[in-house]
């Protein structure tokens, strides 16, 4: 369902008389309140977990010789990820290859904590040591920090999670899989039920929302991994 369809379905499920909305743009009063509840429900679902797999995407950028850090942004010398759409790095997904060679020369990059990176690669003469980077870190400002500092063009790739976003146009479609779209409707029903003192609507929304969220949590989050046995 798109944004408009979600709003229409919410009105129907809440038992609100009348029809519509016919658009999500330029509404007022009760219809605008309904539209806001749907958008709030969508935001609530997105922010329940930062690492929903439908928020995960991949970025690539090319290093600049003698430049160790790459800030968020889309201009020259950045990591190519817009601040507006960035949510969180998936730090265990980074790799690189010499740009001139191609991905036949690809290697994984180990993540290290920022203080370790700073004390290792940004100290004394090591600041000026340039070669192929084999480790990476994330600064407090969410910049990508490479170690050692690259000595030429390397293509860096890694995954990150998109920031939560609101819907604004009739045809906007939420990013979560279609089989879970009704979770937005059920969560919006809870807002309607609380506002209108309609416990039957609230309780039905809460029950069905809980069912879908449990399924989504089991199906759409990274698999849990376990540490090896202690020596």
Regions found by a protein language model. Give the residues of each.
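Glycine-enriched, solvent-exposed interface loops adjoining structured elements
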Residues: 1-231
């Amino acid at each position: 369902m798109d944004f408009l369809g979600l709003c229409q379905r919410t009105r129907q499920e809440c038992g609100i008389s009348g029809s519509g909305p016919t658009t999500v743009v330029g509404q007022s009063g009760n219809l605008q309140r309904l539209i806001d509840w749907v958008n709030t429900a969508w935001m609530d679902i997105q922010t329940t977990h930062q690492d929903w797999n439908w928020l995960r995407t991949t970025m690539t950028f090319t290093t600049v010789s003698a430049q160790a850090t790459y800030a968020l942004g889309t201009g020259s010398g950045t990591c190519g990820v817009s601040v507006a759409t960035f949510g969180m790095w998936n730090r265990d997904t980074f790799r690189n290859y010499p740009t001139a060679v191609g991905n036949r020369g690809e290697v994984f990059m180990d993540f290290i904590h920022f203080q370790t990176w700073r004390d290792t690669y940004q100290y004394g003469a090591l600041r000026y040591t340039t070669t192929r980077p084999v480790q990476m870190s994330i600064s407090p400002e969410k910049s990508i920090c490479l170690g050692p500092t690259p000595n030429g063009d390397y293509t860096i790739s890694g995954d990150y999670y998109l920031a939560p976003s609101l819907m604004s146009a009739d045809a906007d479609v939420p990013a979560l899989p279609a089989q879970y779209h009704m979770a937005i409707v059920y969560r919006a029903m809870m807002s309607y039920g609380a506002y209108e003192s309609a416990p039957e609507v609230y309780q039905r929304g809460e029950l069905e929302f809980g069912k879908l969220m449990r399924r989504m949590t089991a199906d759409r989050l990274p698999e849990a991994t376990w540490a090896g046995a202690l020596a």
